[in-house]
Regions:
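Transmembrane helix interruption/hinge and helix-loop junction motifs
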Residues: 24-32
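Short hydrophobic "helix-edge" motifs at membrane interfaces and signal-peptide entry regions
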Residues: 3-4, 29-30, 67-69
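Short, amphipathic, aromatic/basic-enriched membrane-interface segments that mark the entry/exit
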Residues: 1-10
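Membrane-helix interface segments
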Residues: 7, 28-29, 61, 103
């Protein structure tokens, strides 16, 4: 992993994801972790997209179909379910049921989920831009 190839956003995503999944083993948040880990259901389509590039199938019908599956799964699990599950967890963290949790723990999850959700939207628009470039013909002047 390097800043040069992956970028700071990818490294932040990895660190927050890893630490968030490690720290989630508290009785209060164990059920909520599954809703967040569902974000990764879009990852196989991203990996297939990368593989098709490496196999020289960039811009092929197969890659287009995979790209549509990637976008659909991404919107569904990261932008709809992900935001909903994040809201549920943050609401629970700040409810009376979580009064015994330390403030740093609450802040870590609240801010971490905000950052991860923001990254999901940033990456979605980057994917749209990349797919537009790849699958729509360039306008001739």
């Amino acid at each position: 992993v390097s800043l040069r190839y992956e970028g700071l956003d990818f490294i932040i995503h990895g660190l927050l994801g890893l630490s968030g999944n490690i720290f989630v083993f508290k009785p209060l948040l164990m059920f909520g972790g599954m809703g967040i880990i569902m974000w990764e259901l879009s990852t196989p389509f991203l990996n297939i997209h990368w593989l098709l590039d490496k196999l020289g199938l960039t811009g092929s019908l197969l890659q287009f179909v995979n790209a549509m599956c990637l976008l659909l799964s991404y919107v569904t699990v990261r932008m709809i379910i992900g935001v909903s599950e994040s809201y549920k967890i943050v609401t629970l963290l700040w409810s009376p049921a979580a009064d015994t949790l330390a403030l740093p723990y609450k802040l870590y999850y609240t801010l971490g989920l905000l950052v991860l959700n923001a990254l999901n939207y940033i990456w979605f628009f980057k994917m749209l831009h990349a797919m537009r470039k790849r699958f729509l013909p360039a306008k001739k002047e």
